[in-house]
């Protein structure tokens, strides 16, 4: 169960339930739910009982809906196309569905497609279309609302799945992508902003949008972002865009820009939550790639009276080799909290010296670490700026034996911790130590536990995506 119920499981489950409500209609859904609870009170039920109640209330057949949504995996892909004539009228405004990412399955979707116009430097919604699609395509504007002279002027941006009603990858067209990157922060509806950012991020992950353009857009937009959850997620996306989707040769300039922008925002903001977000992003970027001119700033944060910020900065200094074990131990002695204990373990493991790394790897196999300390030790080893033999090949060789000799909780932490290293196509041997190593492991461990093979396959898939996207943008160097 631990390997099956993950973030994707819950996210898809919530999206599918939300889509079911949209598909049958909110009134029909609640009426069906009332019938369901009334008929089965104090009894045991299954999914079919709920669907029968919803079918009665909505007068829609739902067995095909269930088959398409609950017995298949992967997201649908939705996109839009249209034609603009000489007088600016939009015709053939069409919603398309691809099942390439979900085994060719074409699902029933009910979505909102909205159009937006740039006016006075901001985006205003002009139209909203309620669209149902079951096959490869369906018209978005059957009444021809936009099929009038000048209609295109009200569609600078086309947003698919605006109300986030379905589980799908929503593609922005080229013009909408350009407009979104420039003006997304001006949209006054947080959900729409989140949907647009998700579309842009999926384009980055699929090699369709240059990560550098995405990063610039995020750094420009986050000061105006009023939703902390969106702001924090975008800053995490920036870090991942650099480390996963840009080859090493393209990272330096972006890294410098991220450091300069996040520390500036940290100093300028008057909002405590925003300060924490920008400071964390700054420290994380410093930890990942350094920056001599910012060392004093990070040392200042290491002395902060905010324990979270202080320990993040201390861990960053350790990972860059700017403090030694004695300093980390002194910090630990001055802070008796459990979080300090965990962070100090991670900091010590991240020290880029052979003795510290050898001790950390020995502790991983010592059977003395708690769950949290195992995770912290592996995270420290991966975060280190150490440039020598990382010990990953030996750790991967022990995946199966560790899995079969430990509890599922420890085994999961070990497998995911060991495999959480990066890929850089510009670094000698990096592809072989990631893609090649895991392919070889899978070839020679065909009879390994299915749950373990699944974890390795998922990490291999991520490495293959990283390699594919990095090679796409290396061509533009």
Label each PLM-derived region with a short phrase.
Residues 1-9:
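Metalloprotease/metallohydrolase-associated module, dominated by Zn2+-dependent proteases
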Residues 21-26:
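Acidic, glycine-rich low-complexity/disordered segments
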Residues 2, 35-36:
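A short, structure-level motif marking secondary-structure boundaries and short turns
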